[in-house]
UniProtKB/Swiss-Prot annotation:
ANK repeats lie at residues 46-76, 80-109, 112-146, 150-179, 183-212, 216-245. It comes from the Eukaryota. Residues 274-336 form the SAM domain. InterPro entries: Ankyrin_rpt, Ankyrin_rpt-contain_sf, Asz1_SAM, SAM, SAM/pointed_sf. Plays a central role during spermatogenesis by repressing transposable elements and preventing their mobilization, which is essential for the germline integrity. Acts via the piRNA metabolic process, which mediates the repression of transposable elements during meiosis by forming complexes composed of piRNAs and Piwi proteins and governs the methylation and subsequent repression of transposons. Its association with pi-bodies suggests a participation in the primary piRNAs metabolic process. The modification Phosphoserine is found at residues 17-18, 20. Keywords: ANK repeat, Cytoplasm, Developmental protein, Differentiation, Meiosis, Phosphoprotein, Repeat, RNA-mediated gene silencing, Spermatogenesis. It comes from Ateles geoffroyi. This is Ankyrin repeat, SAM and basic leucine zipper domain-containing protein 1. The gene is ASZ1. One of its GO terms (biological process) is cell differentiation.
Amino acid sequence: MAASALRGLAVAGGGESSESEDDGWEIGYVDQTSQKLKGQMLPIEEKKEKFKKALTTGDVSLVQELLDSGIISVDATFRYGWTPLMYAASVANAELVRVLLDRGANASFEKDKQTILITACSAHGSEEQILKCVELLLSRNADPNVACRRLMTPIMYAARDGHTQVVALLVAHGAEVNTQDENGYTALTWAARQGRKSIVLKLLELGANKMLQTKDGKLPSEIAKRNKHHEIFSLLSFTLNPLEGKLQQLTKEETICKILTTDSDRENDHIFSSYAAFGDLEVFLHGLGLEHMTDLLKERDITLRHLLTMREDEFTKNGFTSKDQQKILTALKELEVEEIQFGELSEEAKLEISGDEFLNFLLKLNKQCGHLITAVQNIITELPVNSQKIVLEWASPQNFTSVCEELVNNVEDLSEEVCNLKDLIQKLQNERENDPTHIPLREEVSTWNSRILKRTAITVCGFGFLLFICKITFQRK
């Protein structure tokens, strides 16, 4: 008995300095126990390795079998301290995530500030699978605002990797949109940096603040520009204040309005204010979807005025495709007001002027007024009724009001002169009718000429009325 007990102390038979092949360990109680424990440990380690392999390969049935064996816990930790649920989330296996959660896995587990939700949002997989995993974790009360060591939250990872639906889901569960990481990046900044246009649009709709700067003082728009994402740069520069939760882009009419009301081209290399001011060239190209040509044209010192007067060979020389040229030409037609050669009026005013020439002049004048009326109608329709909705940087409204007053005065003068012209023509017509030597013109010609004169007078008066409305509109601003 005593001998047996002594043997249980595992004393080396050959002493501490024994150099025998087996170190002099006696084959007895201790060796038998050690062999027994070794035999038990080996299957556990093998099962753990098999379990990890099943997790990473998505073998759901094997995972369930090993969990049912009771040897491996649902919250067991592997190398680096990861749990089975974290492994499943890292490969975006929604079915495995559901199985583990149903068996009681902790959805709020974290290792070195790395949460399972962050792991799921940054997983390599389809957005559909990632969305399902995130939805499952959120349903088990995973906190969407817990940040990693770099202070990045799940929504930042989702925005960085371009998962639009995941971003929306996180916000719906209380994720903070404007949280900043250690470098001052928000989810919007990450999306702008990586060129995720759909994410940028979604975040702006969800209330992301595009004016939050990084630690080095950069706006999301500037981050996008630095990384050559020019379309996102334009979106972030031309949208309304995103804190209102709305996304509005420049329309064609707003672009035209900007061109008509600006004085000269401006450079945009300064730090942007809350409503970034852009030169005419940038605004014009953006409105036509040609913002990708901005940098090239600016490098060649091509102004908007030069662009609008380019010939076909110049367009080709400067890298414009036929499709781009067509866009610009179409826009020019919409902006074009037909020019009348008023220098010829001195000749037409002579008594030798023919009826056809004079009628042609009246038709041109009438068409000119029609173009002007259409332009004013378009601007009145597109002008925002609320000053908060003004996208572009405007000068003082007093400047616009004073110009409108001058326009109204000019239209009134024009209306008066046209009325004088009408009276003069009517007088001439009456005198000719009373002249016994005059051969009467055909009735239809006389009626048609009278109709043209009436239409011209009505058009001019209508133009004056529209400008009066425009003046009242600006006075309200």
